[in-house]
Amino acid sequence: MPHIKICECNKNGLGHLCNCPNGKHTPTSRKIQGLIALMRPFTLITPFFAAFVYAYVILGLGIFEPHNLLLIITAAFALALLNAISNAINQLSDIKEDKINKPNRPLITQDLTELDVFTFVCYGMLIEILILTILGNIRFALAIIGILFFAIIYSLYPRTKRLFIWNNLTIAIPRGLLGAYAIFSLFGIFATSNPYCYAGLAIAVTIFVFGGNTTKDIKDETGDKQAGIRNFVTVYGVKKAMELTCVLTATSIILLSILAWYDIVPKGEQFLIVLLPLSFVYCMYEKWKYSKFGLWNYFYVHFMLVLVVGALLWHI
């Protein structure tokens, strides 16, 4: 008779609190922690705050009116949830690379199963559909569908993550052009005094994200090379990739400043030029330090700083 190993949860009378895929027992608390890790909460802050910044560009202090505030919070939640869904899809497709690059991710530690992640994605999409139905804005819905489309082609098929240039582009377009379009569409793209405001902001943010996305590839260099993924880090090396990030970061901020000078985007954006020294100093520091940790977090903080400072300086 084969030996039957009894789960510690059952020994303690806690069997009802665990899920046991493939004979391995995962307590509910670890599943919850795994779901939180799956969503990568820190990366959800940027799209949530970006929604408020774009809305402020259009409405100014009108964002604090109850109706507008509720609308913005709902849209911001939709964008943040969509980013969480994108993170989950990416982790489903990156199991091979994550065993090398990110062994602490929930699918690798077996805190979650692939079925758990797929279930989360399905429920997340149902919530997105509910939000789109409540908002009833076809342009916003198209923007959300577009962002989801790019998430799928980046991670699944044709998996542009492995294709040079296309990997950065398929992240920059949804987070830059489409993210801005989603919020502008709620209040009317031409609601601002200058009809080119959306285009200017969206292009500048897209350039910023296109360059900044390289920072996440530094830590993943080893696994990406083994998986045949071609990006700026695996093709040119960390130092040259960081130089490119510095140039693109500076380009986006200079572009915003020029557009502000000619009143195409809010005047306050021209003061973003003061962030250039910060960009270069940090980028060059990381380049020569050859650090593989922390820079992706810096990108998100820097991105939020650019957006928030621009909003605060709106009336200057």
Report each predicted region and the residues it spans.
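Multi-pass alpha-helical membrane architecture of UbiA-family
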Residues: 2-316
